């Protein structure tokens, strides 16, 4: 496994706004304080940096973290978390194409991630089809914490995590409404209102209504969001934040796939269009409701010690009717299908208790963190499947989308599951500053339990099974960063992760958790005037204890000897080149390999892992006669990836262009104060591109999308 190093170009992307804290950075103290105050005003007193769970500056953290702030989200007009991550290095989005947007599916440093965090708490996922999504309309910024994060967050993949920071009440009255239209007969309205109620209370109200045609023919997308929150100053040192997030998705487009032949690969009979739908409009439904009710209670005992309790309750449900495909027939056009449905509901609780303090020992300042968190999920799942490909087949080049008669379907298989899982974690962290040296160390103990009760019915035969997981794990993290003159800060770190693994080996011994560890080194840069930032990082991640097939009994219990290695380089930065022009770029070079397996997969690269990714975005503010105008443009490149696990073919690389423009109408007339218009285009030249899991399951990338928006702020 050899990693080729191309010429490195200095690149740029926003890392973060400086946070509050008594520890001095290398930049002037007045700039730090002003920026910190501004950040805390926007993000709220209960905000904590994702990488440390403290108010410390991410630029001091010896591990890579990328931040996409609210201004960037607004300028680019994103409508999903995956879209918001398109310009983040090390992250590959749209794993299932652009027509599928009901789930946030992406990988970080090569490892798939299906669970986001919202305001520091896990969005609980039942590992089936009920994944809570947060719409960007309710997000203040996104923070991508690269590498293992288990010391602070418990069970997570080793590639990293995404934390979505919610919009919080502000004391200054601000009200924004907008309407939008565009591709797919888009109809959208948004509301964002905040202000003080009295000296103790401040509110925020965010709302959204969106309806549009999906990319695939016959499909629709519809979403409603209602997200109020309240800050209650209970005293000079105590703040209570109450928050609600409700989202209803009556329709969520499609989830069906297309074969590689006719999409990512040539078919002798022709090629499919990017609006292809190989499901059935009589059996295509996804209806989801998500309610998140939470609070944050923070109290400052004094200037050195604070406590924060962050808690949330989730109630979610989803109903789905869909089809899946067999391999394409020998005639290169007939596709056999099965019909299935899922009916799912989940209820869960997540709570995180944090005690943070500052202690001086000689010339060293310690920022201590002690935490205890707990999560519980109760999930119920019904799955029914016709099996035997008894649903009507479809001609991929002349599809009939109305063949299925729901009442005539016979379900030969049914599975009812009740899943109850809990995780308790205790963690300790110390971040120490000694002059220009910043060192961090942390440890965490986790206890994970899961019980699964399954009752299956297959062609009239009833059976029941019980599965139990009781695993614990100890995770560690260490790192150091040194601030040199000129704004450069080299760093190095080591971090660990774990993920529970169900089942037992052939001796009946329960499997151990899958573990990961990462070595990372790099350098961060922040100019004195804070107009330029950059991060160069090199990483090496190893994931162990993956399940593999026993070569002596391929249908028997698995062996726990699998190993995967991901290593690479990321370059990220941002520069304000002039007062009118800014530039952001990033580059990722990654090599991922299955290094231990009992099958021919050893030595292969997993799917969805391009070797190279790069992007560039620039904003220009003309001024003069065009005062109030902004024009932005971006390029994003995703290299070729493996088409299937056996690496038999490649998914082609692609280069896409996005654009956006906005204009403050007050520049035309003072009577139009507060009004603005914007225009955004994604995949401007309508490039056709693909994503594949294997030869039978591919997805089209997002077609060109254009959106026009009228805003009014008062």
Model-derived features with residue positions:
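Extracytoplasmic beta-strand/coil segments of soluble accessory domains associated
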Residues: 43-45, 49-58, 62, 82, ...
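Short acidic/polar hinge/loop motifs at secondary-structure boundaries
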Residues: 105, 121-146, 165-166
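Outer-membrane beta-barrel translocator/receptor signature
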Residues: 125, 137-140, 151-228, 232-238, ...
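Acidic/polar loop-and-plug regions of large Gram-negative outer-membrane beta-barrel proteins
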Residues: 210, 214, 227-233, 237-300, ...
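Structural signature of Gram-negative outer-membrane beta-barrels, strongest in the C-terminal barrel
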Residues: 233, 346, 365-377, 417-543
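Membrane-embedded beta-barrel scaffold of Gram-negative outer-membrane proteins
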Residues: 296-300, 306-312, 318-322, 513-576, ...
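Conserved C-terminal beta-signal and adjacent last beta-strands/turns
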Residues: 344, 368, 607-714
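Gram-negative outer-membrane beta-barrel transporters
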Residues: 436, 540, 560-645, 688, ...
